[in-house]
């Protein structure tokens, strides 16, 4: 979903092993400022950093750790998610974006309905965006050390699903 030498976009508050994982597969991590000066999701910086990377590379992997972002506890609001999807709609269709929503801590976020309401919103992402949901049983079911989880692909076409399976 990316090429050797590409940068992966993550928030500036992130799980440090992303650096090691990226380096081991020939990528590197680029960060955007998670919060603006009002302590809200910084869509402007997110968009600017994504635009900058897409000027240099054909594909972009974006990791958003939400809800119950580790380490801040922050959760993108439905409005934040709409802004992210709207940003994706503004990007050239020739560019390929993979959005990895790391929802490892979703079961610790609180109100189930509230913190799952983003799912129908990200279904609206355009076809050039592959949405992948990463869930961890080690967190949700306290199976620490088991390293058991799932990746769910929200593909709009059979071709995209086939690419995900490879």
Go through the PLM ranges and name each one.
Residues 10, 31, 99-101:
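Hydrophobic residues in well-ordered beta-strands that form the structural core
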Residues 36-114, 119:
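Active-site phosphate-binding strand-loop segment of PLP-dependent enzymes
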Residues 6, 27, 92-97, 129:
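A short helix->loop->beta-strand "cap" motif at the edges of active sites that frequently abuts
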Residues 10-28:
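Substrate-binding/gating loop at the entrance of the active-site cleft, primarily
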Residues 28-38:
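Short beta-strand->loop structural element characteristic of the AMP-binding/adenylate-forming
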Residues 1-7:
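Phosphate-binding glycine-rich loop
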Residues 122-166:
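Conserved core segment of the aminotransferase class I/II
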């Amino acid at each position: 979903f990316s090429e050797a030498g590409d940068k992966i976009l993550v928030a500036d508050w992130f799980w440090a092993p992303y650096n090691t994982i990226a380096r081991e597969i020939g990528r590197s991590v680029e960060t955007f400022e998670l919060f603006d000066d009002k302590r809200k999701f910084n869509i402007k910086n997110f968009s600017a950093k994504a635009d900058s990377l897409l000027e240099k590379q054909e594909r972009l992997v974006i990791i958003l750790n939400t809800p119950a972002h580790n380490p801040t506890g922050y959760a993108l609001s439905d409005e934040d998610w709409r802004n992210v999807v709207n940003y994706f709609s503004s990007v050239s269709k020739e560019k390929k974006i993979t959005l990895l929503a790391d929802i490892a801590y979703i079961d610790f976020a609180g109100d189930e309905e509230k913190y799952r309401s983003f799912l129908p919103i990200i279904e609206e992402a355009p076809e050039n965006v592959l949405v992948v949901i990463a869930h961890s049983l080690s967190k949700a079911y306290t199976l620490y050390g088991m390293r058991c989880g799932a990746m769910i692909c929200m593909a709009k076409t059979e071709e995209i699903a086939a690419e995900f399976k490879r």
